[in-house]
Amino acid sequence: MEMSKLLVKDLMNGKFELISDYIYQIENYVIRVPKSFVTDYASIPRIFRAIVLPYGKHSGASVVHDYLYSKGCELNIERKKADKIFLEILKEEGVNLILARLMYIAVRCFGKTRYKIKK
């Protein structure tokens, strides 16, 4: 459940900076994405942007997922769990189920190189 509004500043380079903390509660987690975190929302290849934009109903899920993948994330969440959380938020936010599954499959198949191992 979204606990705060997602407020961003467009950096005019395909990236967006949070202007306040974004808080989302899912399962046993309260995920606080900090102010100043930079995201590109969903990393959609240009060829598919006619079908799916990088932002939309999936924006909150994308920001949380980017944060969970980042080195700055203080939560000790493995990549597979981060991807499941992404899928659950997509569903909660009312993203079309087929699109949600496709986005989940995409992060499972192509997200490995972006995941930062927490130490």
Predicted regions located by residue number:
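Extended terminal accessory/targeting regions
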Residues: 1-119
